């Protein structure tokens, strides 16, 4: 097993060293979401490890290229409000697994998969302060296949964002020039709010069309009753 920090191929501009979370990010659960991607061997020769090693080296190189556009992913969560990036890079682990892809996929079982593909990524603190936004572990299977395990913070990386990142990484690994590029403008569109203050209750008058009158009256009553309690 080996561990390294993969840095963006180009240094991050000084003005981008801190990324402020948006209101939408604040509302997301502070949890890391795991994902496993399986890749079958190119050929049936399980001893062709030179080719596997070449692919792994290309994965690291292309990840470095991809992080140039996705620079917040290589940072750490600070105070639950910011992503601090200081060129430390993203945690990247390589491990060997003594099982084949067919053994894992023949009878899919999450517990078995977790045992055969142990995660050596850092333990996550409940507060997520100082925790890497994203961590990656690449497992070399004995058949020549590869299993890539990712753990990404749901505060900044939701499903569509994760898909965009993986597409960009794959495009870079293929040497394709059509890699998607993010813009990270959410903090401008949805500025942060102080969520520690209690929500103020206001009477809300609902006017519904296409519904029976008793439903509209009931909802108006519940709204006024809620605002008075």
Each language-model region and where it sits:
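Non-catalytic N-terminal regions of enzymes
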Residues: 1-229
